[in-house]
Amino acid sequence: MIEQSIDNRGVATLVLARPEKHNALDAATMDALTDAAHRLGADPDVRAVVLRGEGPSFCAGGDLGWMRAQMQADAATRAREARRLADMLWALNRMPKPLIGALHGNAFGGGVGIAAICDMAIGVPGMRMGLTETRLGLIPATIGPYVLARMGEGRARQIFMSSRLFDAAEAVDLGLLARVVPPEELHDAVENEVQAYLACAPGAVAAAKALALDLSGAVTPEQVDHSIAVLCAQWETPEAREGIAAFFAKRPAAWVRQKSA
């Protein structure tokens, strides 16, 4: 789930609050973030939104129990659950308030997708990030449009297919993080960004964000629908069944090849 607070300046803070699960995304968390994006976006008193994670990780991606349930579900259920994640990303991305991400620890899969829809994200040294879906026989489909929009095709293809982990410094080079600061400076770095927005006209900020999305060739509903369709198709493959089964059995998947001696 998430925790939410709004201070007397109109700065809202959303906290991914499943630290024991490394803030993995389950259905309840996705729905809560979608609802928060709609409510905060419609609240004229809210000037900026900060998103962070509680505990050792920012967001470890999809919840393992949720993923296991998808493996056992029918096609219609999988499509509905993919739409749930897509709706969350769409709502956060289109929220007419500046969204500032404060990242630490691990950010995998959907956690990278959340970072990609932040108007800016700040990280700390020692982070590990990655699109790890292909290790499971899946693809980073639903988050894909936002990752491509953030990084551009050339940079995204460096990490989109290999499930390779990368650190905060590389995330800056990829365009995913704006900058990296020491952990003890993360709060102040985010606060500096918030203060900049508090000096701006809120209606103009919302209009500028909408214009940036429109001029950039922003993610479209058609792209979202396509990402859901290809993810559902991938779930039906033998690779997906093998990858998920191997993960929960804590064994290498059938396609894993070790480095030559």
Regions found by a protein language model. Give the residues of each.
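Glycine- (often His-adjacent) and acidic-residue-rich active-site loop
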Residues: 53-88, 107, 219
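Catalytic-core regions built around general acid/base machinery
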Residues: 36, 84-95
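Helix-loop "lid/cap" segments that line or gate small-molecule binding pockets
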Residues: 159-160, 211-215, 229-235
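Conserved phosphate-binding and hydrolysis motifs of nucleotide-dependent enzymes
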Residues: 17, 23, 55, 61-63, ...
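Crotonase-fold acyl-CoA enzyme core
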Residues: 90-203, 237, 242-245, 251
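Conserved CoA-thioester-binding segment of acyl-CoA-metabolizing enzymes
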Residues: 1-54, 90, 187, 261
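Terminal low-complexity tails and localization/encapsulation signals of metabolic enzymes
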Residues: 1, 245-261
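Terminal peptide-recognition signature
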Residues: 14, 18, 32-33, 51, ...
